[in-house]
């Protein structure tokens, strides 16, 4: 900007200036434009922090899910059918978590950062949304399935061994995937149309948007509440069983303690997802209160811009933490997977120590000469 522009600008008396000020010159009704533009800049900074932390944390979550699959799948192939029943859902958790991370990276770091959703890329945007929604329901379904397997395996071993076959578990996983796809595709289409209306279809605030929001709310929180109640019920049942038989069988207590710890941290991850899902609905309900939003509205209410940016940062942070915790739960608290991971860590440590010793010896050839002379 030139000096002449600053003298005629509503930001002329501001101590700091920003390149985007020219876009707000027509917003002359602000009582404190300097404070407002500063808050807009703060919101932009928060958005940058959101972007970079999302890339870092979701990438860590993806690597952990991949590592969990690398450990679990070879173990799964060598297991007997009774053991495979539990690990089907563990593998499903890792796969759905990985797909969910990919969806978050697509939406958070590509469409919301580099490529604005438009009619040209609408099918790809719908695909990313469907992947996000569907993976969430598959993840929650795998939580419920895993809890059911643990409940039957500990409290009703006869039903677990005689009536629950591996084929039934596979069918249950397929049903979870089919239901998730059936739910995610239409929801993704209508959510995309809220952002990018087309000439043939649209989803406005006066037409379908309230209904889609309500349906999404019922489905999301219904599934989250169902998952939370199921995990809580199974956890309480296992804790009571552990208390009753604590002094009878040390071996079963070891397995039972592992199952209880697994359920506790899984329940914690689900509660994080509940908190993360509350935020979008809070934002949407807040925005609904403003029926008419002009181009200068958010400049006049710059505090709300920071509020929305903080909400977005909090939501993505909670999601990323939950998706990092989930594979860690499988790796740390499942006895078989944990033992395999521990063996790999020991092997890597031993290999690194051996490599360092070789490099050290090669870098000090005098030591070899002295040793041979002696």
Curated annotation (Swiss-Prot):
Keyword Membrane appears in the UniProt entry: yes
Origin organism lineage: Eukaryota, Metazoa, Ecdysozoa, Nematoda, Chromadorea
Bilayer-crossing regions: 55-75, 87-107, 138-158, 170-190, 217-237, 263-283, 305-325
Compartment(s): Cell membrane
Positions on the Cytoplasmic side per record topology: 76-86, 159-169, 238-262, 326-374
Protein name: Putative G-protein coupled receptor-like protein B0244.6
Keywords assigned: Cell membrane, G-protein coupled receptor, Membrane, Receptor, Transducer, Transmembrane, Transmembrane helix
GO molecular function per UniProt: G protein-coupled receptor activity
Residue numbers on the Extracellular membrane side: 1-54, 108-137, 191-216, 284-304
Annotated membrane topology: Multi-pass membrane protein
């Amino acid at each position: 900007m030139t000096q002449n522009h600053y003298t005629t600008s509503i930001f002329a008396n501001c101590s700091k200036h920003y390149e985007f000020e020219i876009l707000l010159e027509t917003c002359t009704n602000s009582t404190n434009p300097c404070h407002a533009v500063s808050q807009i800049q703060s919101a932009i900074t928060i958005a940058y922090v959101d972007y970079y932390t999302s890339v870092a944390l979701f990438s860590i979550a993806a690597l952990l899910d991949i590592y969990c699959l690398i450990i679990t799948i070879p173990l799964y192939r060598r297991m007997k059918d009774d053991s495979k029943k539990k690990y089907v859902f563990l593998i499903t958790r890792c796969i759905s978590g990985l797909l969910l991370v990919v969806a978050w990276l697509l939406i958070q770091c590509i469409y919301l950062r580099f490529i604005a959703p438009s009619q040209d890329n609408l099918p790809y945007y719908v695909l990313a949304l469907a992947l996000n929604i569907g993976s969430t329901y598959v993840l929650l379904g795998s939580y419920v399935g895993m809890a059911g397997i643990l409940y039957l395996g500990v409290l009703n071993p006869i039903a677990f061994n005689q009536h629950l076959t591996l084929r039934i578990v596979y069918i249950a996983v397929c049903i979870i995937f089919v239901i998730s796809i059936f739910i995610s595709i239409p929801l993704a289409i209508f959510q995309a149309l809220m952002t990018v209306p087309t000439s043939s279809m649209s989803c406005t605030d006066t037409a379908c948007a309230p209904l889609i929001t309500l349906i999404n709310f019922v489905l999301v929180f219904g599934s989250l509440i169902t998952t939370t109640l199921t995990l809580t019920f199974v956890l309480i049942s296992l804790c009571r069983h552990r208390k009753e038989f604590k002094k009878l069988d040390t071996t079963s207590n070891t397995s039972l303690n592992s199952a209880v710890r697994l359920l506790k941290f899984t329940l914690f991850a689900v509660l994080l997802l509940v908190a993360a899902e509350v935020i979008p609905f809070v934002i949407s309900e807040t925005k609904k209160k403003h029926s008419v939003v002009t181009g200068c509205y958010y400049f006049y209410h710059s505090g709300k811009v920071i509020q929305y940016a903080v909400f977005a940062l909090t939501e993505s942070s909670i999601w990323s933490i939950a998706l990092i915790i989930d594979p860690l739960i499988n790796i740390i608290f499942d006895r078989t997977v944990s033992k395999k991971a521990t063996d790999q860590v020991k092997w890597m440590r031993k290999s690194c120590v051996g490599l360092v010793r070789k490099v050290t010896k090669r870098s000090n050839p005098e030591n070899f000469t002295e040793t041979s002379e002696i």
